[in-house]
């Protein structure tokens, strides 16, 4: 999916969070497009049979790399939320010619003993009990209508914090007809597999293949994920290019305009003088 603009010399390749198709970020995309950027995004990462979900996500990384090769004539800013941030940094490390910068939205880099603990948990299967995948594999999938799905999610604590327009966009992008009902289009088993195969090796990859472009980070002030992972590696890799937005791990959905504006500020600061 690409959103066109009158200027085509500035490109954002955006990668979504797990379980949230790219269309869920419509308000961000429109803001960036209005500022003169061309926005490209895979609609649902991990759903193409050629790119299966495996440990440390090498095929998902390649899905992003091949998408950039097809869609963008030259390097782009790789902006990603959660899952998308990790894939962006892995793609930039693998193919530095495709990235002029990486911006992580609440994707703190795991390192040290926490990375080793995750590796052990994955190898033994113990991690599945504590992974978000434990919840996602039991998630309801079908509703009588899209409106019924909206009403269901609107009262859930996580989704109740969303900007109402973003929740509508999530329903529009995340539901599809399934016989007489509507079902989640982001397949539950793929979402669960992504959670259960989180990369434990990113810090090691970046030691062997340091990024050839700037990296920046925007996090949610109340992000549980940031508290769990810590910021030590991210602060080092970003050379202090860190900002915060009030909100949880899903702050792009909670504060879409502020998020879109802050992303552009970070990108503009990193651009060379014209």
Which residues does each predicted region cover?
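Flexible "cap/lid" loop of the alpha/beta hydrolase fold
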Residues: 100-142, 227
């Amino acid at each position: 999916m690409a959103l066109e603009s009158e200027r085509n010399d500035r490109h954002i390749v955006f990668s979504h969070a797990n379980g949230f198709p790219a269309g869920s970020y419509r308000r961000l995309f429109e803001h960036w497009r209005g500022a003169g950027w061309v926005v490209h995004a895979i609609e649902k990462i991990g759903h193409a049979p050629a790119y299966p979900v495996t440990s440390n996500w090498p095929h998902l990384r390649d899905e992003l790399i091949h998408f950039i090769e097809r869609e963008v004539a030259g390097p782009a800013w790789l902006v990603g939320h959660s899952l998308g941030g990790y894939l962006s940094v892995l793609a930039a490390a693998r193919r530095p010619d495709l990235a002029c910068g990486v911006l992580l939205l609440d994707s703190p880099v795991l390192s040290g003993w926490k990375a080793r603990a995750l590796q052990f948990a994955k190898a033994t299967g113990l991690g599945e009990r504590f992974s978000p995948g434990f919840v996602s594999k039991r998630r309801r999938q079908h509703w009588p209508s899209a409106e019924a799905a909206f009403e269901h999610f609107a009262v859930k604590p996580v989704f109740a914090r969303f900007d109402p327009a973003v929740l509508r966009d999530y329903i529009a992008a995340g539901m599809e007809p399934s016989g007489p009902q509507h079902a989640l289009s982001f397949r539950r088993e793929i979402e669960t597999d992504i959670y259960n195969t989180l990369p434990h090796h990113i810090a090691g990859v970046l030691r062997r293949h340091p990024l050839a472009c700037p990296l920046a980070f925007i996090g949610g002030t109340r992000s549980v994920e940031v508290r769990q992972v810590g910021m030590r590696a991210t602060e080092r890799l970003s050379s202090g290019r860190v900002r915060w937005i009030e909100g949880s791990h899903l702050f792009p959905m909670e504060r879409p305009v502020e998020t879109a504006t802050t992303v552009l500020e970070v990108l503009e600061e990193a651009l060379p003088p014209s």
